[in-house]
Amino acid sequence: MFIKKKIDLGHGKVITIETGKMAKQADGSAVVTMNDTMVLATVVSSKTPPSPNQDFFPLQVEYREKYSAAGKFPGGFFKREGRPSEKEILSARLIDRALRPLFPDGYYQETQIIISVISSDTINDADVLGGIAASAAIMVSDIPFANPMSEVRVGRINGLFIVNPDINELAQSDMDICIGGTEDTICMLEGEMKEISEAEMLDAIKFGHDAIKKICALQRELAAEVAKPKRPFSPTVAPDELVNFVEEHCSAELKALAYTPLAKEERAEKTKAIYTQTIRKTLTHFTDRVGPDQIEADPTSAFCLNEHMIEECIHAVEKKVMRHMILDDGKRLDGRTLEQVRPISIELGLIPRAHGSALFTRGETQALVTLTLGTKKDAQSVDTLTDDKDKRFMLHYNFPPFSVGEIGRVGGAGRREIGHGNLAERAIKMVMPSEQEFPYTVRLVSDILESNGSSSMASVCGGTLAAMDGGIPLKKPVSGIAMGLIKEGDRYAVLSDILGNEDHLGDMDFKVAGTRDGITACQMDIKIDGLDYHILETALEQARKGRLHILDVMAEAIPESRADIGKYAPRLTTIQIPVDAIGMVIGKGGETIRSITEETGAEINIDDDGTVTIACSSPEATKAAVETIKTLVSKPEVGTIYMGKVRDIRDELGAFVEFLPKTDGLVHISEIARERIAKVSDVLKVGDRIKVKLIDVRKDPRTGKTKFALSIKALLDTDQQAETNGEAKPARD
């Protein structure tokens, strides 16, 4: 049955949701359209019961942009889509993070959601449409999922909010915020902003939530018309006798441990010991009490002998103890108050060959960030359905397994690393100088050496410090902090600078980065329903205080960017040449520019407007390259010395030398040496590179052509005079 629904969100943003036409063998499918951008989402959930020991929800979200959607060919030899791009991975994470908390607790069926962009108008990003399509596909399926989710993008132009702005509108906007939520609450937030205030952020969220409510209502209408019954689902629940026994035998020890401030590793060891001891006691207790007859009469009693179920019960007690400690006593696992930030230490310039470096340590989280400066050719080429550009600022985040004391795979960046790096990059991008002010390509690499929460925000702080250490004139320093939440009924506590355990056992992970004057990036994930705006307001204000405290500590280490770039960084010199002289500098097949590079060691880039950028770590080599290029594009002047190439030899006349591109002059036989020579070929041969001096310029009265007279002998006389006077001879290329 084909059903189609439509909603107008204003400003010409009309969204259509349809189902029943495409991918009908999937458990659920939906197509969402806005203008000429169309997204197909499908969902399939396994009907095979999960393993009794499974304790996680295996949800896989894949987002793919088909090049054919925009009438483009994929790049590369094979001309077909390959592994997911960074943009596709980030879009998949955006949708995954909003959907995952909305599945019912205990639903562990393997589930796969595939979102395919099947048409693109190249100006509307399909990521938020993919979130709507995925939710609609689940709503019309038989998969348990009570509340629809919608995603929108919010921008602001001249003080007016706009929903789902296209790329042209985003270019004028001072914010780009993706919001995911249900009719009742916000469950996901991510975006970048140009130093907006906390109040402005809250207004943007409220504006986006109004649109989300309308789209969610439309999904409910769609699902009601499909009227597909949901498959029966009963979450596995531990027997009361098991829950009570476990709590009785581990609650006191876990509480005593929670109230004792310990390092991460020591706490983990002591917690593991309590788990092991409690499991042993529980198995001993129930082995004699739960036999085959009882299991046959009550199959759930078998859970009393299941180690995995016992672990789940202990974990529930651990979570309860920590949450009550925070809510009742305002104390945290490491002894801090709710708003207190962990101790911070900063070391700059510790990597000698890097162009800038910083070691940022906050508590037991440590990031080593290094800076590399490059030229325009080092920029990353980005090719998506809505964008085709060179990216000149990038931040890469690495999270090796040793940072949490584990053994693991070492290879390419995973989805989490790409997501964390992107967040830190967006935070710092807003304060980067313009290309005209700082024409370098910039790469920051954050290697997490230790982790106990907030490693992405440590990357923001470390990245800012490394950039300042490397002499990048940032508009303002940026810091970041991760906020947490513990909420039970009407009681709640907002935590500043959360630990890993507080993230794992808490209800929110809200990362906020910005300058003293406003927010530049944020990311929020919520695990509960019912987050109200008052809690968000509290979290934003508390994050502002923490951010300012961190900026104060950073300012003590380095108050402002260094006056100069690192000594090993390439020096960029920019000169302007006439557009019609570009070919002259490049030469036939790149011969001229290649020879300049080989002789000076400088890297040279020429833009179509005649802007020449010369990169070299040696000032002398840079000067030589600049002089050579200026000489190439200048008009020939008598008395100037050039490096030329012998093109032709006439034994009784002289040698024709190309001393400028496509410009030849004659070195008469009498101007080759001080002594008389019989034949030019005795001294020179075609292809020789020689220094010559321009001694005369005149027009041929018969042809009107300009002729140039060159001399080698004049240079020999000059060299002899310089040696007599103890002067250095001039060198010009």
Swiss-Prot record:
Alphabetical GO biological process terms: mRNA catabolic process; RNA processing
GO molecular function terms listed in the Swiss-Prot or TrEMBL record: 3'-5'-RNA exonuclease activity; magnesium ion binding; polyribonucleotide nucleotidyltransferase activity; RNA binding
Stated family: Belongs to the polyribonucleotide nucleotidyltransferase family.
Chemical reaction(s) catalysed: RNA(n+1) + phosphate = RNA(n) + a ribonucleoside 5'-diphosphate
Residues engaged in binding Mg(2+): 503, 509
Pfam families: KH_1, PNPase, RNase_PH, RNase_PH_C, S1
Named cofactor requirement(s): Mg(2+)
GO cellular component annotations of the record: cytosol
Name of the featured protein: Polyribonucleotide nucleotidyltransferase
Gene of this entry: pnp
UniProt domain KH: residue ranges: 570-629
Known EC number: 2.7.7.8
Subcellular location: Cytoplasm
UniProt KW keywords: Cytoplasm, Magnesium, Metal-binding, Nucleotidyltransferase, RNA-binding, Transferase
Class of enzymatic activity (EC top level): transferase
Organism classification: Bacteria, Pseudomonadati, Chlorobiota, Chlorobiia, Chlorobiales
Keyword Transferase in record: yes
Coiled coil: none
UniProt cross-references to CDD domains, sorted A to Z: KH-I_PNPase, RNase_PH_PNPase_1, RNase_PH_PNPase_2, S1_PNPase
SUPFAM superfamilies (alphabetical): Eukaryotic type KH-domain (KH-domain type I) (SSF54791), Nucleic acid-binding proteins (SSF50249), Ribonuclease PH domain 2-like (SSF55666), Ribosomal protein S5 domain 2-like (SSF54211)
InterPro entries given in the database record: ExoRNase_PH_dom1, ExoRNase_PH_dom2, ExoRNase_PH_dom2_sf, KH_dom, KH_dom_type_1, KH_dom_type_1_sf, NA-bd_OB-fold, PNPase
Function: Involved in mRNA degradation. Catalyzes the phosphorolysis of single-stranded polyribonucleotides processively in the 3'- to 5'-direction.
